[in-house]
């Protein structure tokens, strides 16, 4: 194995892309309370994760309806400290976005195209991905809503799911979706290496279902450990 491949293994940039419309407060609280479980499993390993990530950065990004809400996109810098990440999560306020659908495609497009640090740079830009061969890039989505089929951001106005798919693939991003069992998410989950946990319970609407999913502390901790193992596995793969 050459030096570049050895360098790449065990390195990951992770974006938690979270719907911060009004109904999402319980899910955000659950993430804030349990993010330490994710980071510990990611960086130290456990029974599910035998190849922990040795070098990680993460950030929490919020999105709402890009057409209806005054603050539709809440960005943060990449950090490599669990308390700093928890502080970012605490800063995401669940409000607005009362009417579905939300603007997930716009948010994904912006995150995918945030740019990358120059190859061989001596320092990392906290506003950009690492250079593509230096780290796995993972975007973890939490939402309880459907999404608009067309984007409204100026740089991609009128674009749809195929444009987002292209952006995700071209920027070497792996998607992990925690989202309702609704049309559209199956299409996103078909992007290479993507995963979709369809959140659904008999008799519950999507908002109630995500509350139930995240409020079961034992199961949610296990979910985050499994997510950490999945991210670690992605970080084992060489990003070309």
What are these regions (language model features)?
Residues 1-240:
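Divalent cation-coordinating acidic motifs and surrounding scaffolds
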């Amino acid at each position: 194995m050459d030096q570049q491949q050895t360098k790449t293994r065990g390195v990951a940039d992770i974006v938690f892309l979270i719907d911060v419309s009004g109904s999402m407060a319980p899910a955000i609280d659950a993430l804030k309370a349990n993010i330490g479980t994710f980071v510990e499993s990611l960086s130290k390993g456990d029974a599910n994760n035998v190849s922990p990530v040795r070098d990680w950065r993460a950030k929490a990004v919020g999105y709402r309806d890009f057409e209806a809400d005054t603050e539709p996109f809440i960005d943060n810098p990449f950090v490599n400290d669990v308390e700093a990440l928890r502080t970012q999560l605490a800063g995401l306020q669940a409000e607005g976005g009362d009417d579905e659908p939300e603007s997930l495609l716009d948010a994904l497009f912006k995150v995918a195209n945030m740019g990358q640090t120059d190859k061989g740079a001596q320092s990392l830009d906290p506003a950009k991905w690492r250079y593509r061969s230096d780290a796995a890039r993972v975007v973890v989505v939490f939402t309880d809503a459907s999404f608009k089929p067309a984007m409204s951001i100026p740089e991609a106005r009128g674009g749809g799911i195929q444009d987002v798919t292209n952006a995700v693939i071209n920027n070497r991003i792996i998607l992990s979706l925690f989202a309702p069992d609704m049309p559209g998410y199956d299409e996103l989950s078909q992007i290479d290496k993507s995963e979709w946990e369809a959140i659904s319970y008999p008799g519950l609407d999507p908002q109630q279902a995500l509350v139930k999913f995240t409020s079961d502390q034992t199961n949610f901790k296990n979910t985050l450990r499994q997510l950490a193992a999945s991210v670690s596995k992605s970080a084992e793969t060489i990003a070309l």
